[in-house]
């Protein structure tokens, strides 16, 4: 079962973010104080089940207290084409990891990552190696800011 933001905000410690993809799944982790998101590379296992296993293992290895999975939304707020696959993936991660897993809107994260990589002149193979992790990092930093607001309310 997936968790809400209040449940994740109530946990203490490092948060993991995931940008689930069919080819690569980007990963990022926060510091224990939840102020800074840092990209942590990507995984390339095939399919939802293998990706969920790899993410649950990475969360355990890095000591994550909660996991955030990007939810692809259209600009009008409706679910994107991959939303159902991402929900299935997030549900599997929740079961396998035993951690609170929430989904968060990932609109424009890949666009923001692409713009950053364009501005820093990262191209070709190097770009493919970092874009998914950078997208997860953007998802996580946005989530950290939202969770900090919940903690102050």
What are these model-derived regions, one by one?
Residues 1-18, 23-153:
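Phosphate- and other anionic-substrate recognition elements at nucleic-acid/protein interfaces
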